[in-house]
Regions:
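Active-site cofactor/cluster-binding pocket
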Residues: 1-138
C-alpha cells in the first residue's frame, strides 16, 4: 500500500494487485492475497526451506505454472543475476521494484528515482539506480 495516508499496511485476502517475491515458493505462499487477474513478479531463484534441506520434503515443481493456473499473471525472471550484474546480489529488491515500475505508467520515472535518492545512502545510490534501471529493462 502506498499513498498520502496509509491506514494499515495489512490487506485482506484477494485484494492485492501485485505480489513481489524474492523466490517462487514465497509467491506461492502468498497467492491467496492476490486479486483475480493480479500480477506476481517473482525471482526464479529457489531457496530451499528447512524440510527440503533436511530431506523431509522436495522443493515443489512447476510453481510458476501453478501460479498461472490459479489465475495470476506471472512475471518470473532471474532477478538475482540482474542484481549481480548491477553490482550486488543485495540489490535484488531494487531490481524487483524497477520491474514493478514498468506496470505503473502513471508514475513518472523521475518520481521513482527521487524515491531511491530519498531512502538510499549516497554511497549506494549509483548501484541502486543501475539495479532499478536493469529491472525496468528485464
Amino acid at each position: 500500500r502506498f499513498g498520502k495516508k496509509v491506514y494499515s499496511p495489512v490487506i485482506d485476502k484477494g485484494e492485492a494487485d501485485y505480489i513481489l517475491s524474492f523466490e517462487k515458493l514465497e509467491a506461492e505462499r502468498w497467492i491467496e492475497y492476490l486479486k483475480v487477474g493480479g500480477k506476481i513478479i517473482t525471482n526464479t531463484q529457489e531457496v530451499d526451506p528447512m524440510p527440503v534441506i533436511t530431506g523431509a520434503a522436495e522443493y515443489p515443481a512447476d510453481i510458476v505454472k501453478k501460479l498461472e493456473e490459479a489465475g495470476a499473471k506471472v512475471d518470473a525472471k532471474d532477478f538475482l543475476s540482474i542484481a549481480e550484474e548491477a553490482g550486488s546480489s543485495k540489490a535484488v529488491n531494487i531490481v524487483l521494484m524497477g520491474r514493478l515500475s514498468e506496470y505503473f505508467d502513471d508514475i513518472p520515472y523521475e518520481d521513482w528515482s527521487t524515491a531511491i535518492d530519498a531512502i538510499v545512502p549516497e554511497k549506494f545510490r549509483e548501484l541502486n539506480h543501475k539495479a532499478f534501471d536493469l529491472g525496468r529493462q528485464a
